[in-house]
Amino acid sequence: MKLFVHLVLFISLFIPYFTKAALYVDIKKSSVGNIGLVVSKCTCKTALESELSENIAKVIGTNLSNCGLFNVKRGAEAESKSWKSDTVVTVSLSEISGSALELSFRLFDTFTKRELLTQSVVFPAKDWRKIGHLVSDVIHDRLIGEKGHFNTKITYIAEEKDSNYKSVRKIAVMNQDGSNIKYLTNGDRFVSTPRFSPNGKGIVYISYANGKSYIILKNLKDNTESIISTFEGVVSAPRFSPDGKSLLISHSLGGETNILSLDLSSKRTKKITKGSAISTSPSFSPDQKYMAFSSDISGSQQLYVIDFTNKSKKPKRISFGSGRYATPVWSPKGDLIAFTKIQSGKFYIGVMKPDGKEERLLSEGHKIESPAWLPNGREIIFTRTESPSNSKLYLVDLVKKNQKMVSTPTNASLPDWSYF
């Protein structure tokens, strides 16, 4: 049965203060994607007001549509009277000075005739997109009861051919909606596996030169970078600890590939796995008590979990399906582990419980890999490679398994999504 939320969200010009209300829809008890939402704009006095209100309305509509919880109507469809039983977002702005505008809104329940929320914000015109994301977060928070992720970012490897048809790889970062793309490296060296720090202020990545591996931290605020550590051999698959104090890495040297913990303060390393097995792709649980990783301890590549609260710290195998398993990533909620599965020449992105139960495959393809979680714990971004010259980023949701491509101007791979 289609769910309608009897709410109207008006953006007015007369509310100079903030208040809050506690009302939300329990999505666990609702039909996902069936919350009716109409996004429209009010008549504006100036050309600037009209242009920016339309832009902000478009950002809000796109954000809430893409999150998979709302059935969003825009344009002519939004002008019909069917919105009376849907949630309505009406965008309007007022110019305060040459470059400053005021955006205010109230949340109104048409069923109970009760005002639920009033807010107002003054912002420079250049920040209109950020304001659109902010309003999207507020709507998501009030209607769903969960913090929105619309002011987060995506990092990935951008790859294209230069004039000599040589592959050039750069670290890229962009807003979650694909806007404001920036390249953090210039393509003069091989780079791999960018990963956000827990606070989102930095990105760590690996660079290789002269037979050595360099772990580099990029400061996103001032664009400076520093070498955290240098290793002989090959380092791969860096992953921050949830508290941001250490890194998990995979290190290959002398015929062994083991997982190390690197303390970011002392720069000291500690071996977590030992032996001749190839162990890689480590990922902490959110509480930092467990670590998932892939290894061929049993003879084939499988998923394992180490319990750090257990003195023995013996790896426990959790994958028992046919095929090989790789790149485990713990969800931000701690309830699932995403992974790549390779079976009979096909690749799959799937999830399972931390104990290995309830395995579900969400997507399949010629070559799909490198899953990373969105902050909401309900969607996964991954790499889909159709050919050596065609790799793109895709999203898949856990409930309906709907997929959509994330637009990038070049080939893209190895994504990571910042948390709140």
Curated annotation (Swiss-Prot):
One of its GO terms (cellular component) is periplasmic space. Keywords: Cell cycle, Cell division, Periplasm, Signal. Residues 1-21 form the signal peptide. GO terms for biological process: cell division; protein import. Pfam families: PD40 (PF07676), TolB_N (PF04052). Its main location: periplasm. It is found in: Periplasm. InterPro entries: 6-blade_b-propeller_TolB-like, PD40, Tol-Pal_TolB, TolB_N. Belongs to the TolB family. HAMAP family: TolB. The Tol-Pal system is composed of five core proteins: the inner membrane proteins TolA, TolQ and TolR, the periplasmic protein TolB and the outer membrane protein Pal. They form a network linking the inner and outer membranes and the peptidoglycan layer. Part of the Tol-Pal system, which plays a role in outer membrane invagination during cell division and is important for maintaining outer membrane integrity. This is Tol-Pal system protein TolB. It comes from Wolbachia sp. subsp. Drosophila simulans (strain wRi).
